[in-house]
Regions:
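Flexible, acidic/Gly-rich N-terminal and inter-domain linker regions that tether
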Residues: 1-90
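Cysteine-centered iron-sulfur cluster-binding motifs in ferredoxin-type domains/subunits
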Residues: 95-104
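Structured alpha-helical segments in the cores of large, soluble enzyme domains
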Residues: 130-134, 187, 217-230, 319
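Structural preference for beta-strand elements that scaffold enzyme active sites
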Residues: 140-142, 173-175, 194-198, 233-237, ...
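Conserved radical SAM core fold
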Residues: 147-150, 181-184, 195-215, 240-244, ...
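Active-site glycine- and acidic-residue-rich loops that bind
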Residues: 175, 243-256
Length: 339
């Protein structure tokens, strides 16, 4: 797959599978209109397709299917210790999509699901109902924790649903993290100061090597700049940093490139973090044998695989030395394991 996917269109999914139970759901009806009827298949339950035995994750990555389904059970989960809650009293993530349009070698999703296909749960109203009891106090919800919701916004409409819900609930803060270049799906909306649009940025060489099917660095930066100019709060995330030969030059040049495009004063925050993954997810990633990222000699502590502490510290020192030339330390957040 080439690095030229600015947003989601039906051509990126070869077929649309729909659970019979959600055929009449308003979101299903809207999505159906975007597909050729000959490529729509009705099923009883999403697991008939998503959980089939003997699937090839690698092969499916080149011909993804979209599955529309009804989610039973919890949409909301406590935020992971591998992520940043940005100081909010409560940090939750929403799981309204299984799988991702993109195919990044270092992503834990590679080892999490049996399929590379995407399941979109259309009953997002149930997520909102589950969230209401948490909104008596300050709460952050990450909508793209285990997918890229903005990448499929042209089909799903879920980001707009989240933004509409957030307007009515003043204790709700959203982080919408993306590698997409699809800000145009939100361009005409009024910015909400409690919503942060966060772009994951990597050197172009890292994108080409590890972040398959994702937009280029140039495209992501343009989208982030458009968001800033439209009045949105924008966070830039150089995370995960991949320790590879010449990483110092790759990532310091990246920071220069970012701030040649974006006024540092316009960036709400910059986050920096090196690669980390749960030991169980890393084991699953190794079984796929797709990338050298899985076979680095990581250190494992408290079930978390990370770079050896000296390397992790060196990565952070190199990036901070460059980043603080542009942004003060109080607007930079870093991830470090607890020693």
């Amino acid at each position: 797959l080439k690095h030229s996917s600015p947003s989601c269109t039906p051509r990126l999914f070869s077929h649309l599978y729909i659970e019979k139970a959600v055929l009449d759901h308003p979101q299903t009806r809207r999505i159906i209109e975007k597909f050729d009827r000959s490529n729509i298949i009705v099923i009883g339950h999403y697991k008939e397709v998503f959980n089939r035995p003997s699937q090839s994750f690698a092969a499916q990555s080149h011909a993804k299917k979209l599955i529309l389904a009804h989610k039973e059970g919890k949409f909301l989960h406590e935020g992971s210790p591998y992520s940043d809650g940005f100081g909010h009293r409560q940090f939750l993530y929403a799981s309204s999509v299984m799988g991702c349009l993109y195919d990044c070698d270092y992503c834990y999703l590679q080892g999490l699901y049996p399929s590379a296909n995407t399941v979109l749960f259309v009953n997002l109203e149930d997520a909102f109902a589950q969230l209401l009891p948490h909104l008596g106090h300050d709460t952050l919800v990450a909508t793209s924790y285990d997918t890229d919701t903005l990448a499929i916004e042209s089909l799903s409409g879920q980001t707009r649903q989240w933004l509409s819900f957030a307007e009515r609930h003043p204790n709700l803060h959203l982080e919408i993290r993306t590698k997409s270049a699809n800000f145009r799906s939100l361009r005409e909306l009024v910015p909400n100061p409690r919503v942060t649009l966060a772009w994951t940025l990597s050197p172009q060489a890292i994108i080409e090597r590890y972040e398959h099917a994702t937009p280029s660095l140039e495209s992501r930066l343009k989208a982030a700049k458009d968001a800033v100019e439209a009045g949105w709060k924008v966070r830039l995330c150089i995370d995960p940093v991949i320790h590879t030969e010449g990483f110092e030059t790759l990532y310091t040049d990246l920071i220069d490139t970012i701030f040649a495009s974006l006024d540092p004063e316009s960036v709400h925050q910059l986050t920096l973090g090196s690669f980390r993954m749960s030991q169980n997810h890393l084991r699953s990633l190794k079984k796929l044998r797709r990338s050298d990222v899985a076979f680095y000699p990581y250190e494992v502590r408290d079930e978390m695989a990370t770079y050896p502490q000296a390397i992790e510290q060196h990565i952070l020192e190199v990036l901070l030395a460059k980043a603080t030339l542009y942004i003060p330390m109080e607007r930079i957040r870093t991830w470090q394991r607890q020693s």
